[in-house]
Regions:
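An aromatic/glycine/proline-enriched structural segment found at the starts
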Residues: 221-222
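Catalytic cores of DNA base-excision repair glycosylases
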Residues: 2, 6-7, 11-198, 202-211, ...
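Conserved small/polar residues in nucleotide/adenosyl-binding loops
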Residues: 227-229
């Protein structure tokens, strides 16, 4: 398959949503946004994001925040382990990195509450490090692009898809590329209902569109059956 990055980035620069953590993609802002957007829609998270940053504008402020105030700022978002891990990580960053997130994928990945995806997002978007940031949107795009019926919830399959993602990533714009894939999955190659193929910059390359199988993808692993003895 020909490289997708040029067509994808052209589309992204013309069609991406204007979001505060894109306008100012500093490491703290990107990290906070990615944690808030876990299990929460963008439209719902934005007021919390802006209020949180107004109260705690940097990592040292987050590290020093009293628990009651911290939970009040998070109230309504749910999944409170997210904000507890945010503060744990902030305190480690203050102790070990002078209050600034490290410009290193592995160091980011080692912080509480930061998994492969969030580490990749911060590293690529804020620091320009050529690493993947693969979420459900990206897996869906690549499952359809290659018309691949493999179950994306399987670790080995996700690893193979991640390798494909990296084959197309331009070394000079890893953050924009990662965001473009996420945006394409969120706005065009949507999970529920028919994908908006007529608006997709990759439609001419999409194997699932050609085969008429886009609605069947991505596939997830079948649940294990219980055997009663």
């Amino acid at each position: 398959m020909e490289n997708i990055s040029s067509a994808l980035l052209d589309w992204f620069y013309k069609n991406h949503r204007i979001l505060p953590f894109r306008t100012d993609p500093s490491p703290y802002h990107v990290w906070l946004s990615e944690i808030m957007l876990q299990q929460t829609r963008v439209s719902a998270a934005l007021p919390y994001y802006e209020r949180f940053l107004a109260a705690l504008p940097d990592i040292p402020a987050l590290a020093a925040c009293e628990e009651e105030k911290l939970h009040k700022l998070w109230e309504g978002l749910g999944y409170y382990s997210r904000v507890r891990n945010l503060q744990k990580a902030a305190r480690i960053v203050c102790e070990q990195y002078g209050g600034q997130l490290p410009a290193d994928y592995d160091a980011l990945r080692a912080l509480p509450g930061i998994g492969d995806y969030t580490a990749g997002a911060v590293a690529s978007i804020s620091f320009g490090i050529p690493v993947p940031a693969v979420d459900g949107n990206v897996l869906r795009v690549f499952s359809r692009l290659y018309n691949d019926p493999a179950a994306v919830t399987e670790p080995a399959v996700k690893k193979a898809f991640t390798a494909r993602v990296m084959e197309h990533q331009p070394p000079d714009a890893p953050g924009d590329y990662n965001q473009a894939l996420m945006e394409l999955g969120a706005l065009v190659c949507v999970p529920n209902g028919a994908p908006l193929c007529e608006k997709c910059p990759l439609a001419h390359l999409c194997a699932a569109r050609a085969a008429g199988t886009a609605l069947e993808l991505p596939r997830k692993a079948a649940p294990l059956s219980l055997i009663h003895i």
